[in-house]
Amino acid sequence: MELVQVLKRGLQQITGHGGLRGYLRVFFRTNDAKVGTLVGEDKYGNKYYEDNKQFFGRHRWVVYTTEMNGKNTFWDVDGSMVPPEWHRWLHSMTDDPPTTKPLTARKFIWTNHKFNVTGTPEQYVPYSTTRKKIQEWIPPSTPYK
């Protein structure tokens, strides 16, 4: 009987993603192929799902969009692609998704969500406010004879 339930669940996963092709596409992008109820979609195209049959911590997930802010994100997904209003629902800080209870506007929340820019030319690099302990040696500018 348990084997029948496992096979039934596997068949639901394949059909829930639109057949074998859709199942493989989702599996290779996310390394997981869960089936759940669609809770909502943000303005960037990320889709958020929930399945209460899964254990806590894996019962909510996101399927990322293939393009965000002009960047192709089909294979290059990043956790910072989730906007703050969905972040709090995704990490179980609240039980109400932003589709039912919108996030209150705050000054520090941007209207257009950005990626994490660490390791890119746009990253923030603070300038040093202290003198260096060791100074670099600058060779003389006159050429040797």
From Swiss-Prot:
Its main location: mitochondrion. It is a peripheral membrane protein. The modification N-acetylmethionine is found at M1. It comes from the Eukaryota. Pfam families: NDUFA12. One of its GO terms (cellular component) is mitochondrial inner membrane. The keyword Mitochondrion applies. It is found in: Mitochondrion inner membrane. Keywords: Acetylation, Disease variant, Electron transport, Membrane, Mitochondrion, Mitochondrion inner membrane, Primary mitochondrial disease, Respiratory chain, Transport. GO terms for biological process: aerobic respiration; mitochondrial ATP synthesis coupled electron transport; proton motive force-driven mitochondrial ATP synthesis. GO terms for molecular function: NADH dehydrogenase (ubiquinone) activity. Coiled coil: none annotated. Belongs to the complex I NDUFA12 subunit family. Accessory subunit of the mitochondrial membrane respiratory chain NADH dehydrogenase (Complex I), that is believed not to be involved in catalysis. Complex I functions in the transfer of electrons from NADH to the respiratory chain. The immediate electron acceptor for the enzyme is believed to be ubiquinone. It is linked to Mitochondrial complex I deficiency, nuclear type 23: A form of mitochondrial complex I deficiency, the most common biochemical signature of mitochondrial disorders, a group of highly heterogeneous conditions characterized by defective oxidative phosphorylation, which collectively affects 1 in 5-10000 live births. Clinical disorders have variable severity, ranging from lethal neonatal disease to adult-onset neurodegenerative disorders. Complex I is composed of 45 different subunits. In NDUFA12-knockout cells, complex I assembly is not affected, probably due to substitution by the NDUFAF2 paralog. This is NADH dehydrogenase [ubiquinone] 1 alpha subcomplex subunit 12. It comes from Homo sapiens. The lineage of its organism: Eukaryota, Metazoa, Chordata, Craniata, Vertebrata. The gene is NDUFA12.
